[in-house]
A protein has these predicted regions:
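N-lobe entry segment of adenylate-forming
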Residues: 1-65, 70, 76, 89, ...
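ANL superfamily adenylate-forming
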Residues: 8-9, 40, 130-188, 203
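Conserved AMP-binding/adenylate-forming
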Residues: 44, 61-108, 446
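Conserved adenylate-forming
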Residues: 65-69, 176-190, 194-237, 257-259
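AMP-binding/adenylate-forming catalytic core of the ANL superfamily
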Residues: 105, 122-124, 284, 393, ...
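Conserved AMP-binding/adenylation subdomain of ANL enzymes
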Residues: 215-234, 242-283, 297
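Gly/Ser/Thr-rich phosphate-binding loop
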Residues: 281-286, 295-358, 370
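Conserved beta-loop-beta connector loops within the AMP-binding
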Residues: 336, 372-390, 423-427, 473-475
């Protein structure tokens, strides 16, 4: 059993996420601190105080005009945007449960997501409305969800048949309300957010996070790596808000520590790096393919990235050669951090810190996290021997939405079974070496083989289907 070397954060169990964010200000940032600016229109901004006020007023509108009740699911289907952030906070403030859906999802995939989530409201980007409508035509949900079209005034097409966000909400005369109150309840049992993950196998499942989970994640980040997660952090942000990594780092963290984030609708390599240079970003977030390209790309040598002190890579471990290449490019003091996690553990299993790096290791357990490494019979394995990674901690998810069987099978004696194979060295550093689970990782995205097989087998001329691995050295995929 391996415990975190960092202090265990004290996670409150009697506040909602909104109450926590309203009452805690670790870097004492002023209310007028600009925390969000749009990637495509930098004049569109949001301060800490504006985010809170809008959440309080929009929550009132959700309750009075849309009938949103505690625990109701609101799906957000759209790319990263300031409106996405504002929606999530309004839903939390009202006591609802927001559910992110990847904006690249097809109508076929949406039918599955909507069936699992059973939303009372679907907030959809105006450009994606036809796709959402197509999916809803194919479904027979218990109740028909109300549609809310998301689009800022500068780019939203007017949809006469549906209310719009934020336009119609901003014109509302609703008075702000107090945040969802959990002062006399156990926040470990109250859902706050949801995203989709394939888990260890099968089709994507709705991973439900409690208010306790999300608060614990924020505290874990801060305690484990305060050098990076603070008010002085600046970044252009492309990881999808529909995934837990994007939810916490891009949606919740700025509302807590007051760091500056520019949401990027869709990742584009050169525009991302150019904006990081212009913004004087302190952090780069990369997947292995982008990291490898940076090391080899002579076209970016003229960009000033001297403000970057940390590179965070997730999706798969970086090779030692890529880590060294990034340090040559950005400076020898740059922290290149391999992160590891899964949606069900809120991505805080193992973290490097500024002063604790070891090649392509994924680090040590984050604050408050305990890890076991076991063989196929769930016996502990010795140091240096591969085994499955099992996890305990306050960031471990609440449940799979409406799926008690899969929820139960994800645990063994209270430990979350990750399905990932790791080994630990004599210094307590973890190394990710493989996967037991049936899951393909492509550029940071999860793809379940069973989904690919189902699509292939739907063709009348296909009798059977399977997959095999293929290595791409230019994307740093393993042999």
């Amino acid at each position: 059993m391996y415990h975190s070397p960092y202090p265990t954060p004290l996670v409150p169990s009697d506040v909602s996420v909104s109450q926590f964010l309203l009452s805690s200000n670790p870097d004492d940032v002023p209310p007028d601190q600009k925390i969000l600016s749009d990637f495509d229109n930098q004049q569109q901004t949001l301060t800490l105080q504006e985010l809170r006020f809008n959440a309080a007023r929009d929550a009132s509108t959700f309750i009075s005009r849309f009938g949103l009740q505690e625990g109701d699911v609101v799906c957000i289907f759209g790319p990263n945007s300031i409106s996405w952030v504002a929606l999530a906070h309004a839903i939390l403030w009202a006591g609802g449960c927001f559910c992110g859906i990847n904006f690249m999802a097809t109508a076929y995939e949406l039918t599955h997501y909507f069936t699992v989530a059973q939303p009372s409201i679907i907030a959809v980007d105006d450009e994606l409305l036809p796709k959402a409508l197509e999916a809803l035509k194919q479904l027979k949900l218990r109740t028909t969800p109300r549609l809310l079209v998301v689009g800022d005034e500068s780019n939203a097409r007017k949809q006469e048949d549906y209310p719009r966000f934020p336009l119609d909400f901003r014109s509302s005369k609703e008075s702000p309300i107090q945040p969802f109150d959990l002062s006399r309840r156990d926040n470990r049992k109250i859902p706050a957010g949801m995203c989709f993950s394939s888990g260890t196998s099968g089709k994507p499942k709705g991973v439900v996070f409690s208010h306790h989970n999300l608060i614990a994640y924020l505290l874990t980040l801060r305690v484990t790596n305060p050098f990076t997660h603070n008010a002085y952090m600046r970044e252009a942000f492309f990881p999808s808000f529909a995934h837990i990594y994007g939810i916490v780092s891009g949606v919740l963290l700025p509302a807590w520590v007051g760091n500056h984030v520019q949401p990027m609708r869709k990742f584009e390599y050169l525009p991302y790096l150019r904006r990081c240079s212009e913004l004087k970003a302190t952090v780069l977030r990369l997947v292995p393919a982008a990291a490898v390209r940076m090391v080899k790309d002579t076209a970016i040598r003229d960009l000033d990235l001297s403000s970057v002190h940390t590179v965070m890579c997730s999706g798969a471990p970086l090779s030692d050669a890529t880590v060294k290449g990034l340090k040559r490019l950005l400076g020898p003091e740059t922290n290149v951090l391999n992160g590891y996690g899964m949606s069900e553990a809120t991505i805080t299993l193992l973290r490097h810190t500024r002063n604790g790096q070891k090649g392509s290791s994924v680090g040590k357990p984050a604050a408050g996290v305990t890890v076991c490494v076991v063989d196929d019979h769930f016996n502990d394995v010795p140091i240096g021997i591969e085994g499955e990674c099992l996890v305990k901690g306050p960031t471990v998810f609440m449940e799979y939405k409406n799926n008690q069987t899969e929820t139960a099978s994800a645990f063994r004696d209270g430990w979350l079974c990750t399905g990932d194979v790791v080994k630990v060295d004599e210094d307590g550093y973890f190394w990710l070496t493989g996967r037991k689970k049936e899951l393909i990782k492509y550029k940071g995205n999860q793809i379940a083989p069973v989904e690919l097989e189902a699509i292939l087998l739907s063709h009348p001329l296909v009798m059977d289907a399977g997959e095999r691995a293929r290595s791409y050295r230019e994307e740093d995929t393993p042999d």
